[in-house]
Regions:
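Extended low-complexity, serine/threonine- and proline-enriched intrinsically disordered segments
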Residues: 40-68, 166-172
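Short structured motifs
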Residues: 15-19, 31, 73-78, 91-95, ...
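Beta-sandwich strand segments
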Residues: 116-123
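Extended, solvent-exposed segments with strong compositional bias
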Residues: 66-87
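Contiguous beta-strand segments within globular domains
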Residues: 2-50, 146-162, 167
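Residues that flank catalytic or metal-binding motifs in active/ligand-binding sites
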Residues: 44, 88, 103, 122, ...
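Low-complexity, Pro/Ser/Thr- and charge-rich linker/hinge segments at domain boundaries
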Residues: 128-151
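Ligand-binding face of N-terminal immunoglobulin V-set domains in extracellular IgSF glycoproteins
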Residues: 84-115
Length: 172
């Protein structure tokens, strides 16, 4: 982080209390917001990196995981009003007119000043899921009385009919 960046929030859709997990193809997507302690607007740009399950760079080229250009401007901003500390509040939604995601998985979002592309001021992680195998969960009363006070009994069914599952122990 740059020490002038504050109040970073990353969340699904419009709910700031939600986890940063979006559904592939959902126009609500991910929202990223932050405050920049400054008197005037600074021009920020962003780029995305597709990561593997351990958040390491995947090595995929941009066209394999997104449609559009893997660079855009953070254009949504508002100046602070009636505060003792001056700041500019920035907001970005993904997907947007510049970037459409093609793959589910882990993404790293990097934000940097337009004039200094090598000087990243913040980066944040978000995930995109794909609903290929619906999961049905039901809670039922516990059958073992010894565990009743501290445990729950769940029945979980995964519908893999439409999904390609070769190794259920690792793929689910």
């Amino acid at each position: 982080f740059n020490d002038r960046i504050r109040t970073l929030q990353v969340f699904a859709g419009c709910d700031p209390l939600s986890m940063p997990v979006a559904v592939l193809g959902d126009p609500e997507g991910i929202t990223m917001e932050f405050d920049h302690l400054a008197d005037d607007r600074e021009y920020f740009r962003y780029s995305l990196e597709y990561c593997d399950a351990r958040w390491q760079p995947s090595g995929l080229v941009d066209s394999e995981f997104l449609d559009g250009f893997n660079e855009g401007t953070v254009d949504d901003y508002a100046f602070s009003e009636a505060t003792s500390t001056h700041y500019v509040h920035y907001s970005l939604k993904i997907p947007n007119e510049q970037i459409q995601l093609k793959l589910s998985g882990n993404y790293l979002l990097k934000v940097y000043p337009e004039s200094e592309p090598d000087s990243i001021v913040l980066q944040c992680r978000f995930m995109v899921s794909e609903q290929t195998a619906p999961v049905h969960i039901t809670a039922s009363p516990i059958t073992n009385i010894d565990y009743m006070a501290a445990h729950q009994q769940l029945e979980i069914a995964i519908d893999t009919e439409g999904a390609m599952v070769e190794d259920p122990f690792n793929d689910l």
